[in-house]
Amino acid sequence: MKFIIKLFPEITIKSQSVRLRFIKILTGNIRNVLKHYDETLAVVRHWDNIEVRAKDENQRLTIRDALTRIPGIHHILEVEDVPFTDMHDIFEKALVQYRDQLEGKTFCVRVKRRGKHDFSSIDVERYVGGGLNQHIESARVKLTNPDVTVHLEVEDDRLLLIKGRYEGIGGFPIGTQEDVLSLISGGFDSGVSSYMLMRRGCRVHYCFFNLGGAAHEIGVRQVAHYLWNRFGSSHRVRFVAINFEPVVGEILEKIDDGQMGVILKRMMVRAASKVAERYGVQALVTGEALGQVSSQTLTNLRLIDNVSDTLILRPLISYDKEHIINLARQIGTEDFARTMPEYCGVISKSPTVKAVKSKIEAEEEKFDFSILDKVVEEANNVDIREIAQQTEQEVVEVETVNGFGPNDVILDIRSVDEQEDKPLKVEGIDVVSLPFYKLSTKFGDLDQNKTWLLWCERGVMSRLQALYLREQGFNNVKVYRP
């Protein structure tokens, strides 16, 4: 099988040296992602496209899906590469490829040509289009908005029959811009803002301020791992968890009610800036949107920014909540965000929307900054790829099995889309579908006399969810890894 990767248009308008660097980085990213599926595949870069060739036909859909999620790719063409002799030969090959698709449909032919030939692209379009129209009686030519567009590419003596076109996510390849640290909470905003910076070519590390114990951290780890695995797995990134409960306790005890929200955000920015400086990261990323909550007015945002020299990026600053939720739905984080535990440890009864710098600084003089230094020093930093391994250690009490007994039921916790694409069928045992984001509310409705074997494709989500259910008091869960 063969795929032609078309570059994001903004890459093609760069200078020659920058364009070549971007293409080289994108080629490396594609190799890093796809080597997990087929170690024998070849990735070859050209001036205006990248070729991916693989032998394992069983991995075709998986490879195609992975390519649509790599930043820097505008679209992917799945092609059949064949030699040709003349225009009539092109027509005959197109007829074999497209006959079934064109039955009863309107169509047009679009051709791109590279190399020296005694015909033009328009000549091929007319010849092939006329031939298809004559040989498929129920088909009809329509040049604007046809039901089917027959895409052909001619390069020297090779014909590329386009079997399918699939849109990528665009943007710049990860690694073409500098690293950033995303302040991730697991909600709608921070997930979308992290994705937007990945799409713009940044390697995104994650910093999580834990206000709610193990269950909260498990949920946020799931979101961070999902974002990395889906859009940024070409690079290693860090997941830094900071236990912020001592800081919250100090704020609740010593800070005036109306100033709590702004001061908490200032403490988070101070802590994140220290982490960023430690690892050489150039900027922080937050999901703040103008006016969404009291701490996100221009006055308050300016005061929050003042505590650090580190650049703070807010890609969602002008977005409304509906737009953010729609983006979360597109990238697959909506269900995580909807079921994420809410921990509002610092809730002011009358939060200020226009904080005064002198008052904020006066309140912060009451704060013991050694507490902040200590929680940053004790921050837990892991390679995001180790989240799965670390979860294995944490869920020692949850048994992992590769077989099943008479009282066992497999619980497929993948998302609905994944279940529809690859239904799970295991001979000799019932399989029940319950997406991971419904476990917290629906698992208790299942037959608790059964032993439930949680399963997902890579085993990360099933382990995290097993730990979560154990914490909720459900002891009839195991992890299924055949």
UniProtKB/Swiss-Prot annotation:
Keywords carried by this UniProt record: ATP-binding, Cytoplasm, Disulfide bond, Nucleotide-binding, Redox-active center, RNA-binding, Thiamine biosynthesis, Transferase, tRNA-binding
Annotated pathway: Cofactor biosynthesis; thiamine diphosphate biosynthesis
Active site: residue positions: C456 (cysteine persulfide intermediate)
Residues binding ATP: L183, I184, K265, G287, Q296
Residues annotated as domain THUMP: 61-165
InterPro entries: Rhodanese-like_dom, Rhodanese-like_dom_sf, Rossmann-like_a/b/a_fold, ThiI_AANH, ThiI_fer, ThiI_N, THII_Thiazole_biosynth_dom, THUMP_dom
Cystine residue pairs: C344-C456
SMART domains referenced in this protein's UniProt entry, alphabetically: THUMP
UniProt xrefs under Gene3D superfamilies: 3.30.2130.30, HUPs, Rhodanese-like domain
Gene Ontology cellular component list: cytosol
Keyword Ion transport attributed: no
Superkingdom classification of source: Bacteria
The reaction(s) this protein catalyses: [ThiI sulfur-carrier protein]-S-sulfanyl-L-cysteine + a uridine in tRNA + 2 reduced [2Fe-2S]-[ferredoxin] + ATP + H(+) = [ThiI sulfur-carrier protein]-L-cysteine + a 4-thiouridine in tRNA + 2 oxidized [2Fe-2S]-[ferredoxin] + AMP + diphosphate; [ThiS sulfur-carrier protein]-C-terminal Gly-Gly-AMP + S-sulfanyl-L-cysteinyl-[cysteine desulfurase] + AH2 = [ThiS sulfur-carrier protein]-C-terminal-Gly-aminoethanethioate + L-cysteinyl-[cysteine desulfurase] + A + AMP + 2 H(+)
Locations listed in the record: Cytoplasm
One Gene Ontology term of the molecular function aspect: tRNA binding
Function field: Catalyzes the ATP-dependent transfer of a sulfur to tRNA to produce 4-thiouridine in position 8 of tRNAs, which functions as a near-UV photosensor. Also catalyzes the transfer of sulfur to the sulfur carrier protein ThiS, forming ThiS-thiocarboxylate. This is a step in the synthesis of thiazole, in the thiamine biosynthesis pathway. The sulfur is donated as persulfide by IscS.
Family, as annotated: Belongs to the ThiI family.
Protein name: tRNA sulfurtransferase
